[in-house]
Regions:
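Short, acidic loop-to-helix structural element flanking the phosphoryl-transfer center
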Residues: 404-408, 413-462
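A conserved acidic beta->alpha catalytic loop
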Residues: 24, 39-48, 67
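Cell-envelope/extracellular polymer assembly enzymes that use nucleotide-activated donors
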Residues: 3-6, 34, 198
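Conserved nucleotide-sugar donor-binding catalytic segment
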Residues: 147-233
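Conserved donor NDP-sugar-binding/catalytic core segment of glycosyltransferases
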Residues: 99-135
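C-terminal subregions of glycosyltransferases and related glycan-biosynthesis enzymes
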Residues: 165, 181, 192-193, 212-322
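Glycine-rich, basic loop-to-helix element that forms the pyrophosphate-binding segment
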Residues: 65-82, 89
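Short, acidic, metal-binding catalytic loop of nucleotide-sugar glycosyltransferases
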Residues: 23-32
Length: 1013
């Protein structure tokens, strides 16, 4: 009978690491599997280890090559012998988490996926384990269908290692059999390097369903002797280079046969990426001529110096976060692998199997306020307060014979406290039960533990302290897909509680088992762990997501923005219900696994998804609600979002728009570059062009001013500039030099006819796109661009800004008579490049307009984007928009969503974003290393490094805050980085920003000096 899963393990020279690999297979939770061990003529005696495992366990089968044929061929040999419905590959020096294959196969079966991808955890030789957050986020969606599978794979151009490796996947064998004939040419060759790409290109091309399973996967063990660690071995290095060239040639030919030209273009990007990466490594193993020869063979049209648009070498690998093993230990305990083998598994229900989208359970009561006011016929009492006080009274009034309260007890106490009617109590009891069912969601990690225990043949029981009745809880469990438990122990039915051990004792008595035969798993350290252990049970903690989110020893996410309004308002005022609900959503999303990677010195653990979802997403939601409210109040019928700042916000507005919002939206280009004809219409405005003159050279300046420059060869322009004393490629060192150059340009090189033609084209375009009654959205700030638009359209066009600069905007608003409405009443401390990078589209900028067939159309710059910046921007913005979608889907029609019409709530919702701008911890700032922010006008063609920019601005903001008397804040939250600062500056920094640390270090220093004396 065929197995469900076949796992192929090629073996060559890995005898030392082989036992860990094979043990991880032997102990897999999926028992219906076969393990095909391919001995590729391993020279180190590994065959004896394979034979021993095959002798002890019939699921292991050994296949032998008489001579070494390479990794690609060994995998093909194993795959040809496979019988399973699904297929997986595992390298013999790696190992797999205990429940990966069962969970991945289950996901594929439930959703008809062809491919399921798990996590990758890197293990160093010293045993330390870590994840690479960028790789973990490389797939934006956890489910892809149809051509979206192919598109997602090729668009990332092999930059994300985890996407194209074959050994962290489970593959439907029907898909493999379709792909296998294409592999035949390579199977005859000896290939050991990047063979994953050859397999994956074909698999992803034909796959129609892709799923992402999180929380389980493969441990990739780093070894200096591995196939990728060849820098110190020239012969091995040359062989690897040759393999890579063959793999890319194979992949390109396959795509050519399929007519997949767009995929081929992306593959060429990947080829350049690998050429650059290996050329860097080659410096250690080869001389320069040989590097050139090898690189030319791999990618003939590649230039190491010329391809500046390629991402920084290893950027995708750089941010690293420690992996935490808590959930893996729970899974192993359920399976009885680490000395404890309990036949009964007990699981808590609320916050272990079921989640609500709230930071605290009481927040659910706040969502019922509107229904309370209708049921109670309007009163001054808050339902959340009344409900909380009623439960406290009910517990105080319980008779000694009753252990726990019920809903009847609670609402009876409310009747006594407030004198509300039976009808009101009946309505609110019903409303609360229905709200619990409506808001509940499965906790994926908890459900996986439940299913794992069932698959392992354990008796699975549910144990809960809860006032809700059993029928309501069963409805919640069924909604969350949880069925088939073997016992349900509910405190108000059993008349016993967990905290004193009584409910645990009833459980063991009714099941007829000894306490040490039960493993209990729950989210509360005292009730689910300490109390269970006191009752004689084994117990393990699965931390509640919201508790992890709020724990500063795990993450600084909840602390973001706390210092932004310090001294102006209270902490409670900065935590309205909407923000608490946002925190609940974020906690459930990122800490569903209570041991998900997180560190105390970071907010996002360097995950772009966390930065996007929580920090950018909350601000995006607030901005969108503000815009809709303002447009409704101002009677705006057409709102035009200006590129590139408005692209993301427009999508959020469209998500939230209701029938009450009649505003029509559009999106048009309006860059500094394309508006230069209007910005320079008046000669007096030339001196205040929005440029950083210090980064410009005459060459760059004339490219910028090409729309109004005389027709002449570049050589002639250069000759005239240098003859006038302006060296062609020398930056302007002083503002006076820049001003002198502009005067020279106006006198010698300016063409008024060209300028007028460019102005007329821009005017025709904007008159059509901004008809009467239109308003604009732009990020801000000075009003120059809006003034230019008003000048071109010859009418006052209102504008909505995130914020204005407070000086020029007022002056220009008055001069050109356009109203300015700002989300923030004053400029925030951190603005500019980082804000725009997070919120703006990274599409190619508009550089001007041209006439085509009696129409004016925008002209865009060539797409020379940095792939790393593109990935980071897309990932952050995708998850920000997902937050808006989740918040709307969860809270639409409730008071939570309605509260976002309040400007104070909008401001509070933006504090995490402002905190991320100003207080980004250094561990998260690693995401910005070598990420350029490009502004063709402001910065010329120079790219601003975001990490450096953010560090400088946050330090300036911290100093300014201190000068204004702001309270102390933890040094790691304000951009002061002690590890990267000299002794004197470090001392001053601690004194200014972290006085407690300063005092501790001072005492330590004085004590050491005293001992030395």
């Amino acid at each position: 009978m065929a197995a469900t899963l076949s796992v192929v393990v090629p073996v060559y020279g890995t005898k030392r690491d082989l036992p860990a690999c094979l043990e991880s297979l032997r102990t897999q939770s999926l028992r219906d599997a076969e393990f095909l061990l391919v001995d590729d003529a391993s020279p180190d005696g590994a065959g004896a280890v394979l034979a021993e495992y095959a002798r002890r366990d019939s699921r292991f089968r050994v296949l032998t090559h008489s001579q070494n044929r390479g990794l690609f061929a060994a995998r093909m040999t194993g795959a040809d012998a496979a019988t399973g419905k699904y297929l997986a590959f595992l390298d013999s020096d790696d190992f797999v988490s205990v429940d990966f294959y069962r969970a991945a196969v289950a996901l594929a079966e439930e959703n008809d996926f062809d491919l399921v991808m798990g996590d990758t955890v890197w293990q160093r030789e010293n045993g330390d384990c870590f994840v690479r957050p960028v790789h973990a986020d490389c797939v934006l969606e956890d489910e892809l269908r149809g051509n979206a599978v192919r598109d997602a794979f090729f668009q990332q151009a092999m930059t994300c290692y985890s996407f194209h490796t074959i050994w962290n996947k489970v593959i439907r064998r029907d898909l493999w059999l379709r792909c296998a004939p294409y592999y035949a040419p390579l199977a005859k060759k000896h290939i050991v390097m990047t063979e994953d790409i050859a397999f994956s290109v074909v698999l992803y091309f034909f796959a129609q369903g892709f799923g992402r399973h999180r929380g389980d996967g493969v441990f990739y063990c780093e070894h200096a002797s591995s196939s990728t660690g060849a820098a110190g071995n020239p012969a091995k290095f040359r062989k690897n280079y040759a393999d890579i060239a063959q793999v890319f040639a194979f992949a390109d030919e396959f795509l050519h046969q399929q007519g997949a030209n767009q995929a081929r273009q992306q593959l060429q990007k990947a080829r350049k990426w690998y050429a650059r990466m290996w050329a860097e490594q080659a410096r250690k193993a080869a001389n320069q001529p040989e590097i050139s020869r090898l690189t030319a063979a791999l990618c003939p049209d590649f230039s190491l110096d010329g391809d500046a648009n390629l991402p920084e070498i290893f950027w995708f690998d750089q941010p690293m976060t420690p992996w935490r093993d808590g959930t893996e230990r729970i899974k192993r305990a359920i399976l009885g692998l680490d000395g404890i083998d309990c036949p009964v598994i007990s699981l808590d229900v609320f916050d272990t199997l079921i989640l609500r989208p709230f930071r605290t359970p009481i927040d659910l009561f706040h969502t019922l306020e509107g229904k309370w006011q209708r049921a109670a016929r309007r009163n001054m009492t808050s339902f959340a307060q009344a409900r909380t006080e009623a439960e406290s009274c009910a517990r105080a009034w319980l008779p000694e014979t009753q252990a726990d309260v019920t809903m009847w007890n609670i609402y009876s106490a409310m009747m006594q406290n407030l004198g509300v009617s039976d009808d009101c109590v009946g309505q609110m009891t019903y409303n609360e039960r229905e709200a619990e069912i409506h808001f509940c969601r499965p906790r994926k990690t908890g459900v996986q533990l439940f299913n794992l225990a069932k698959a392992a043949g354990k008796r699975v029981v549910l144990t809960s302290d809860m006032y809700l009745d059993a029928d309501t809880i069963r409805r919640m469990l069924e909604k969350c897909g949880i069925r088939g438990w073997d016992g349900f122990f509910l405190s108000n039915e059993q008349n016993a509680l967990k905290w004193n051990g009584a409910l645990y004792r009833k459980l063991t008595a009714q099941l007829g088992v000894k306490p040490d035969n039960v493993l209990h798993i729950g989210d509360n350290a005292k009730i689910d762990v300490e109390a269970a252990k006191k009752a004689g049970l084994h117990a393990l903690l699965l931390p509640r997501p919201a508790d992890v989110f709020m724990d500063a020893d795990c993450t600084q996410m909840a602390n973001l923005g706390h210092g932004c309004l310090a001294g102006f308002t209270t902490a409670d005022s900065m935590q309205p219900l909407a923000l608490r609900c946002a925190q609940g959503l974020a906690a459930n999303r990122f800490f569903d696994d209570g041991y998900a990677p997180a560190t105390a010195d970071s907010a996002f653990a360097a995950y772009p998804s966390r930065l996007g979802y929580y920090a950018v997403g909350t601000h995006l939601l607030a901005l969108a609600k503000w815009l809709l409210c303002r447009c409704r109040a101002d009677g705006v019928k057409r709102l035009v979002f200006l590129a590139r700042d408005g692209a993301l916000l427009r999508q959020a507005v469209e998500l939230l728009r209701t029938d009450a919002d009649a505003v029509e939206t559009d999106y048009i280009p309006a860059s500094r570059r394309c508006l230069l004809p209007a910005l320079m219409a008046n000669p007096t405005d030339w001196a205040v062009l929005p440029v950083r003159w210090a980064v410009y050279t005459p060459e760059k300046a004339l490219k910028l001013l090409s729309f109004c420059t005389l027709d002449a060869p570049e050589s002639e322009l250069r000759h005239q500039a240098e003859a006038a004393g302006f060296p062609w490629q020398s930056p302007f060192q002083q503002k006076t030099r820049w001003e002198s150059f502009l005067r020279f340009f106006r006198d010698k090189l300016y063409d008024g006819c060209h300028h007028q033609a460019a102005y007329s084209a821009a005017r025709a375009y904007y008159e059509e796109k901004l008809p009467e009654g239109s308003a604009c959205f732009d990020m801000g700030y000075s009003g120059r661009l809006q003034a230019a638009l008003c000048q071109l359209t010859q009418r006052a066009v209102p504008v909505y800004y995130v914020h204005a600069d407070g000086r020029n905007s007022e002056r220009l608003s008055a001069a050109y008579d356009f109203p300015v409405h700002c989300f923030y009443p004053m400029p925030p401390a951190m603005s500019g490049a980082f804000r725009e990078f997070l919120l703006s589209s990274d599409e190619a900028p508009c550089v001007g307009f041209e006439r085509q067939n009696a129409r004016v159309v925008p002209v865009y710059a060539q797409d020379g984007r940095n792939e790393a910046a593109h990935f980071l921007s897309n990932c952050v913005q995708h998850h920000a928009l997902q937050f808006v979608r989740d918040f709307h889907d969860t809270f639409a029609g409730t008071g939570v969503m309605q509260s976002l019409d309040n400007p104070g709530v909008q401001l509070a919702m933006s504090l995490p974003f402002e905190g991320a701008l100003r207080q980004l911890p250094e561990a998260d700032a690693e995401l910005l290393r070598n990420i350029p922010f490009e502004d063709m006008v402001f910065a010329g063609e120079n790219a601003l490094d975001l990490r450096t920019l953010v560090r400088d601005q946050s330090a300036e903001a911290a100093v300014a805050a201190h000068e204004m008397g702001a309270v102390d804040a933890p040094s790691r939250m304000i951009g002061f980085i002690p590890e990267q600062t000299g002794l004197v500056k470090r001392t001053i920094g601690f004194l200014l920003f972290d006085r407690e640390t300063f005092r501790k270090k001072l005492r330590k220093r004085m004590k050491r000096m005293s001992n030395e004396q």
